[in-house]
Amino acid sequence: MPTIQRIEQAMNFKPLATVPCNNDLLAENYIDDGRQLWLIDYEYSGNNDPTFELGNTCQEMQFSNSQISEVCAAYFGDALPGMIARMKLNMIMSDVGWGLWAAIQAKISTIDFDFWGWAIERWGRAQEKMDSAEFSKWMKDVAS
């Protein structure tokens, strides 16, 4: 996976301080009781790059580019190209990571779910982004 290594190297060029993260913020892990918003499911929580948390969430929610910019601005105070690029690259890493997780689950889980199909879907989505015209721009923006 040389492209994954390139992403890691680009992200490590200017690393961000890690912050407490849930690392699994998909829609099902939010509960809104009308008075308060609850975040649940902390089995993967720990300190991480905040752009992974944001990128993973944007990927899971299938946010548009404008929504991704809004999330970036809400967290960092501005939709900075370098931070958006980090989020976009972490959206790829989210799909790669969850795709690998699903491939493992396909072999070991007793749950009646098509984990293998889900793994293929996630990998395909990651590959599509790595093959996109925007990928090289994100890699450059991360370093700037």
What are these regions (language model features)?
Residues 20, 38-41:
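Pre-DFG segment of protein kinase catalytic domains
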Residues 86-92:
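Alpha-helical transmembrane segments of integral membrane proteins
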Residues 29-39:
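Conserved protein kinase catalytic/activation segment
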Residues 50-81, 92-110, 125:
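Active-site activation/catalytic loop segments of kinase-like enzymes and analogous catalytic loops
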Residues 1-23, 33, 140-143:
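An alpha-helical support segment within catalytic cores of ATP-dependent transferases
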Residues 101-144:
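ATP/Mg2+ or Mg2+-diphosphate-binding catalytic cores
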